[in-house]
Structure formats: C-alpha cells, structure tokens
C-alpha cells in the first residue's frame, strides 16, 4: 500500500489565497454516462438519512497543525490504546488510533519526471529523497467515519456498522478478526489486536499490572485479542454529553461537544461538532472554500475533512 501519487495534501500560498479562497482546492471530474461529473456526484451507494438528530463532523486545519503529537498521546490515554514497543512497530503492528503523516518536499516532481522521461517507479523512489531545505506538512489521520464506508460492506458478521449520527461503529464482541475491513480501508486506520496486550507480560508497559490498570479509562472497553479497533470519535464522551443534556432538559451546546484530540490541540487545528447544528463551528468550516475530503476521488463521504494548507512564502 502506498499513498504516493495521490493528492493527500492540498495547499496554496497566501497571495493566491487572498485572491481566491478556493485556490489549491480542486476536485477532479470523471466521465460518466451523464457526462463529466465531480467525484462527489458519482456513487453506487444509497445515502444515509442524516438530516435529523446529530451528525458529528471533525475538521483538521493543515495550516494550524504543527505535528506536536498532543492529539495522539491524549487519544492513547483516553481510549485505553496499548503501547506495543519498537519491535511490534517494525512489524507494522502499531495500535495508534491516530497517526500524524509527515510529508517533505522533494526536488523530484511529476513535471520533472515528464521532462526527463523518468519511469513512475524511479520517480517515486527519488521523491522519497527530501530536498536540501524541504517544505514540511503534518497531517493527522484517523478513521474518517465515512458515510459510504468501504469497511462496512465487507464485514461478514456486521461487526462494523453505521450509526444514525454518521459514526462508523465497532462491535468488538462480534468481530471475528477477518481483517477484511482493514484491507478495504483506503486510509489504513484500522488496527488489529495481535495479542491480549492487557494480560501479556511481553508488553510490560502500563496495562498488565494492578497499578497500571488503575490508569485505564473505565468508560472505554479494553479490547481482546483477535479483534479490530479504530477511532470511535470518542463515543463515550458523546454519550455522556447527551445524557447530561437530557437530565438538564436542554440542547447540547456546540462548545461542549469535544473529542479528546480536539480538546487537547494547542493550536485549535482540530474542531469537532454537530453539522446539523446550524450555528456550529464545524458546519461553518465544512462550508468554507478551503474544506476538502482526503482521497476525495473515492467519494466515500468522510465525516472528517481537512482545510487546505496556506503557506506564507517570501515570493508570495
């Protein structure tokens, strides 16, 4: 699996952004029997009815993100995610629900490869070599909670399903570990429990002793061996907020709805909220001209979206 060659990060410079707020944010069109259509209008799926009740969305501003990792650490602590160590990481058995992808600019570009008639394999190999003074982009990636989710329709036991609030849910005690969902996920954000980390002395980090277990979040289940896990959009916090609002007999306030990654972000790069709340910040951001979906050509309609990165260059 590689993400090379795909438009993961969309960016522009300040001068172009001032003239045109949608600069850098383009959507490709595809040939269909109805003519050329943008990717968000081409689909085989039936739409979910998400106009009633809540519709949870999350925005990530690439301009504001500094790649500090606060969101990853807070997610790790909040959701009882096991620490697996270097050896497992080398085997690509990481368990982080969030990751921060780093991209460095290179002297090799598609334009240069065409000019020099270089094969695509050699082009991508040379792209891995950063330039002497590279431009850097940090991109947090978690489960996108797609409304046309490729993972949901391949699970043979319906362990991953779609909620009426736009969330992609996991039923851990139904999962049989086929990993079809992880294979079919274009964002590669699903994690498989190769071991029972909480009871295995090999992973002597924080979970498998009496003192360490006191640190675990009692609102989040500790997953067992052989099941898939992923970002839940902090469903435990959402449910607690809904219960509190129900007891008080008042609607949920936009500022009260928070995932732990959003509340821990020191630059406010991550914003969470209810899209169906017409006054919510996340609704305003979704309608912003900088907003785009990761791998939007797939049209999986994610509930997580990004804001185009704006650079303030000297030659802008």
Language-model regions, residue ranges each:
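Non-ligating segments of multi-cofactor redox enzymes
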Residues: 1-316
């Amino acid at each position: 699996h590689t993400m090379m060659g795909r438009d993961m990060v969309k960016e522009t410079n300040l001068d172009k952004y001032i003239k045109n707020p949608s600069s850098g944010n383009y959507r490709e069109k595809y040939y269909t029997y109805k003519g050329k259509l943008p990717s968000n209008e081409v689909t085989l799926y039936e739409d979910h009815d998400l106009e009633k009740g809540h519709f949870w969305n999350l925005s990530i501003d690439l301009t504001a993100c500094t790649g500090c990792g606060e969101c990853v650490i807070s997610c790790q602590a909040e959701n009882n995610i096991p620490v697996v160590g270097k050896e497992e990481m080398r085997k690509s058995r990481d368990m982080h629900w969030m990751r921060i992808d780093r991209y460095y600019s290179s002297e090799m570009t598609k334009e240069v490869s065409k000019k020099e008639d270089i094969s695509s394999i050699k082009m991508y190999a040379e792209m891995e070599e950063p330039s002497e003074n590279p431009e850097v982009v940090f991109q947090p990636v978690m489960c996108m909670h797609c409304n046309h989710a490729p993972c949901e329709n391949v699970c043979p036991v319906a362990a991953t399903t779609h909620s009426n609030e736009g969330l992609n849910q996991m039923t851990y005690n139904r999962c049989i570990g086929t990993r079809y969902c992880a294979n079919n996920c274009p964002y590669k954000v699903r994690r498989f429990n190769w071991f029972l980390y909480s009871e295995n002395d090999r992973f002597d980090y924080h979970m498998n002793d009496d003192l360490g277990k006191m640190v675990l979040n009692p609102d989040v289940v500790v997953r067992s061996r052989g099941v898939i896990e992923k970002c839940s959009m902090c469903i435990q916090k959402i449910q607690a907020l809904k219960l509190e609002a129900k007891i008080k007999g008042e609607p949920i306030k936009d500022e009260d709805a928070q995932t732990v990654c959003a509340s821990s972000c020191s630059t406010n790069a991550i914003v969470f909220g209810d899209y169906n709340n017409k006054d919510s910040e996340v609704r305003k951001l979704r309608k912003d001209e900088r907003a785009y979906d990761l791998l939007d050509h797939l049209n999986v309609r994610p509930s997580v979206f990004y804001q185009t990165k704006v650079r303030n260059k000297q030659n802008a």
